[in-house]
């Protein structure tokens, strides 16, 4: 094989690799909001505690989220990948069940911009 043939073969491979890279642009993974649902039975102090423990919010942030849920019916606690969001929801439900409270939260897929 001559030198000119090798060069064109290499150039051809590089072109193919570049085209494949363009085709395989990865999309960002979906993100999910964890939404706290207000109820009339769970004490506000417990909700603040859960937000601080599960979502690692400051006491101030926890109170703000709790109050938003209380006044608006629901509030976003955070936005995460699906696995992490599911884990957060499970942790909230476990803490609430263990304490005998009906506190609920749910997932909602975040809208793409």
UniProtKB/Swiss-Prot annotation:
It holds the Pfam family ClpS. InterPro entries: ClpS, ClpS_core, Ribosomal_bL12_C/ClpS-like. GO terms for biological process: protein catabolic process; proteolysis. HAMAP family: ClpS (MF_00302). Binds to the N-terminal domain of the chaperone ClpA. Belongs to the ClpS family. PANTHER family: ATP-DEPENDENT CLP PROTEASE ADAPTER PROTEIN CLPS, ATP-DEPENDENT CLP PROTEASE ADAPTER PROTEIN CLPS1, CHLOROPLASTIC. Involved in the modulation of the specificity of the ClpAP-mediated ATP-dependent protein degradation. This is ATP-dependent Clp protease adapter protein ClpS. The gene is clpS.
